């Protein structure tokens, strides 16, 4: 992985990271280098939440970008998932607010969406509340297109979408990059 424009790169750890890792029957997706932290600590039998207790929001003052993480666990044709956001306390970097949302026995065709910011501002205001309910309809290409077209044009960079067959564990993935 490399930056689209290396001249704008200040802290590579905030830009270059593995956003997706698979550990057995668990798929881990994040917006930062905490992907590896979750993977490594869960591989040592720690939980998703325990792994995230070792991390905080990004150190990119004044925004202190929230770290968003998700994990999907598939077992014997059933699945559950959890999402987390680690963010500063209303822009105060001395405190980290930690929220985890867990979903057991999810309904087919339904999901949840969590994002980093709640619009524009200086500093950018962090996401608030519970993840938004979303309808997951159509095939992977239709869904990918719908999500990409609904992201803010000025702020979107990349999108990763994966459809996983719960019965077999087989999957299809799509990646969209604003800068090709």
Predicted regions and their residues:
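Conserved short alpha-helical segments that host acidic/polar catalytic motifs at enzyme active sites
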Residues: 1-180
